[in-house]
């Protein structure tokens, strides 16, 4: 699947008139500065509760990729489906939230994100539990390292999302619906990013702890929809044809970084965990966030799923 590009002029002309500001615009080249009052407000908001839980994904094999006979929405980049072995690892139970990223920004003296309206006092408390967006791959990697973690590999992300049995969605093979995932309305033809006015028909991002009825087999939330998620890998649509069957880490080099999970603007095929895509690692979009992973030091004891916590 190719993600369509649109000019900033078209997007800003359509969205600013609707009061939507930077929605659906790549803001990689846009920066903001803290104001004294804004930074003071940010420091107060940083005290809000964070979602720091992690989930243990046990060592073992899982079905990675798709079988066209089972999933008619599968793309060629998902072939061939095969068994892959992964060592045990921990992964964030939830997407990294705005308030978690705010703590990092303040601790490392970074500029605020483009969608943070601190100066006008518009950073509502509800935003704290929303997934962070408008972050590049480099931002995501820096945050994970700061938190003592790392970005998950694409294979780790997929196993955490769909378990071992090759299911199409985190909850099984039943089609995605708005009661299970925050994604774009089906039935509308054409890429949303070519028609920015359609964003008015699409749901916004929501808190990372919603959809308890649609968690993955390991209890990981929102591995389908809300925001797509950066992974550690370089992206190559042909990688599966040559990838190792044990702890694959993606191509050794490339020009795009892989992301997974689909987003609130996407249609049903794009929110399947097997769906693969990539983009420039400098990209900062309102549909793209991340979560972190962590190595398990004692693999001998990592044979069962268990919840862990950073604190």
Model-inferred region functions:
Residues 247-251, 277-284:
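Short proline/glycine-enriched turn/loop segments at secondary-structure junctions
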């Amino acid at each position: 699947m190719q993600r369509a590009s649109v000019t900033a002029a078209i997007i800003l002309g359509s969205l600013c008139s609707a009061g939507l500001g930077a929605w659906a615009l790549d803001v990689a080249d846009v920066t903001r500065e803290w104001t004294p009052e804004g930074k003071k407000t940010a420091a107060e908001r940083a005290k809000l509760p964070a979602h720091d839980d992690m989930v243990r994904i046990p060592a073992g094999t899982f079905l990675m990729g798709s079988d066209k006979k089972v999933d008619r929405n599968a793309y060629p980049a998902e072939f061939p489906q095969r068994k892959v072995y992964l060592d045990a690892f921990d992964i964030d139970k939830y997407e990294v939230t705005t308030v978690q990223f705010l703590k990092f920004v303040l601790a490392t003296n970074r500029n605020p994100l483009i969608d943070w309206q601190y100066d006008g006092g518009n950073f509502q408390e509800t935003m704290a539990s929303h997934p962070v967006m408008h972050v590049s791959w480099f931002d995501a990697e820096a945050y994970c390292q700061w938190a003592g973690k790392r970005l998950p590999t694409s294979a780790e992300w997929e196993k955490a999302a769909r378990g071992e049995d090759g299911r199409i969605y985190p909850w099984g093979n039943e089609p995605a619906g708005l009661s299970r995932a925050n994604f774009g309305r089906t039935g509308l033809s054409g890429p949303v990013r070519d028609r920015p006015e359609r964003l008015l028909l699409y749901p916004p991002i929501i808190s990372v702890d919603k959809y308890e009825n649609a968690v993955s087999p390991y209890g990981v939330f929102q591995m389908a929809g809300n925001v797509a998620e950066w992974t550690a890998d370089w992206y190559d649509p042909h990688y599966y044809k040559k990838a190792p069957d044990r702890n694959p880490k993606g191509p050794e080099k490339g020009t795009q970084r892989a992301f997974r999970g689909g987003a609130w603007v996407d249609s049903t095929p794009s929110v399947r965990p097997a769906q693969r895509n990539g983009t420039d690692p400098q990209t900062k979009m309102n549909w793209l966030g991340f979560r972190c992973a962590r190595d398990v030091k004692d693999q001998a004891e990592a044979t069962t799923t268990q919840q862990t916590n950073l604190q």
